[in-house]
């Protein structure tokens, strides 16, 4: 059984879904979403979730399965995705990761070791109590004897990180900093083909702006109203996503609808810029400038030829 893994990444609204479905059909593949918003149920419009029709009969995984009131970690994503990759490969098919969440992608192809996966809520509460009674600096000093590297690198006012470092040592007996050091950036068990779609910035930004307008036409306001009625609030992980937090501001009377729409467009454009910056850090990523290809078919052919001839 081969260990090939195809990745189609890129900024929001660049057109990853259509290309990936076409490739899946031609390469006998199945798709695993690597999008930190499309994991949530009931959040279809604001996350630009792919529809059943758009899936074109290709199985898609890790979409629409997490309750938006729940937290979901990168470590959980890694575990689920690793199992799904094995499952797809065991059936003689090609797993294709598709999306724009760089940290999710790196959790799979950088062989990252997550100390984040284990929690001790009781100990966390105990540490919170210590910090409340004695101050953040007192809590920070507790790190000094067990993890000097974290003590030096984590500011004493970053209480959440200090607590995480102390908790990790209690759970594993190892310094929090040692887990970070084991993140081997380019070590992966897979034979990866990693492509990042891109296009002229002005064109991309225009696509982003139009996508936001379409979201409102499709009923983004109603979607967020329903989520709010379900008890979801702006301090929850799911509701911090672009498009959701801004509509909550509008529904709470903090901003006008016009301001809401413009904030979503600006936030999405800024996010696209950050995504591209992230992907450029990995020398294994092959950038595909869509403007230099006559059609999607040509892009698809280029990727297929790369895989066949490698």
Curated annotation (Swiss-Prot):
Keyword annotations of the record: ATP-binding, Magnesium, Nucleotide-binding, Transferase, tRNA processing
Region (Interaction with substrate tRNA): 35-38
One Pfam family it belongs to: IPPT
Broad EC category: transferase
InterPro entries the UniProt entry points to: Dimethylallyltransferase, IPT, P-loop_NTPase
Entry EC no(s): 2.5.1.75
Any one GO biological process: tRNA modification
Residues at the site labelled Interaction with substrate tRNA: 101, 124
Catalysed reactions, as listed in the record: adenosine(37) in tRNA + dimethylallyl diphosphate = N(6)-dimethylallyladenosine(37) in tRNA + diphosphate
Membrane-spanning segments: none
Cofactor: Mg(2+)
Residue sites binding substrate per the record: 12-17
Record-stated family: Belongs to the IPP transferase family.
Quaternary state and interactors: Monomer.
Protein name listed in UniProt: tRNA dimethylallyltransferase
Taxonomic lineage of the native organism: Bacteria, Bacillati, Bacillota, Clostridia, Eubacteriales
Gene: miaA
């Amino acid at each position: 059984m081969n260990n090939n893994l195809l990745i189609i990444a890129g900024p929001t609204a660049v057109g990853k879904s259509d290309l990936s479905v076409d490739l899946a059909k031609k390469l006998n593949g199945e798709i695993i979403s690597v999008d930190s918003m499309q994991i949530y149920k009931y959040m279809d419009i604001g996350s630009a979730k792919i529809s059943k029709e758009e899936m074109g009969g290709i199985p898609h995984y890790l979409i629409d399965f997490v309750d938006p009131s729940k937290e979901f970690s990168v470590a959980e994503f890694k575990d689920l995705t690793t199992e799904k990759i094995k499952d797809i490969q065991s059936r003689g098919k090609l797993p294709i990761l598709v999306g724009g969440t760089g940290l999710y992608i790196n959790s799979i192809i950088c062989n990252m070791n997550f100390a984040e996966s284990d929690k001790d809520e009781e100990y966390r509460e105990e540490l919170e109590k210590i910090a409340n009674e004695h101050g953040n600096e007192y809590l920070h000093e507790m790190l000094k004897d067990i993890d000097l590297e974290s003590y030096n690198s984590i500011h004493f006012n970053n209480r959440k990180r200090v607590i995480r470092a102390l908790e990790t040592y209690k759970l594993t007996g190892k310094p929090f900093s040692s887990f970070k050091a084991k993140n081997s950036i380019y070590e992966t068990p897979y034979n990866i083909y990693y492509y990042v779609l891109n296009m002229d910035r002005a064109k991309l930004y225009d696509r982003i702006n139009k996508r936001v307008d379409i979201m409102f036409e499709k009923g983004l306001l109603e979607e967020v109203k329903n989520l709010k009625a379900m008890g979801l609030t702006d301090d929850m992980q799911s509701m911090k996503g672009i498009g959701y937090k801004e509509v909550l501001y509008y529904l709470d009377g903090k901003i006008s609808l016009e301001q809401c729409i413009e904030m979503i467009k600006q936030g999405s454009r800024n996010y696209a810029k950050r995504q591209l910056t992230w992907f450029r850090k990995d020398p294994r990523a092959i950038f595909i400038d869509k403007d230099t290809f006559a059609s999607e078919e040509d892009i698809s052919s280029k990727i297929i030829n790369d895989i066949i001839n490698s």
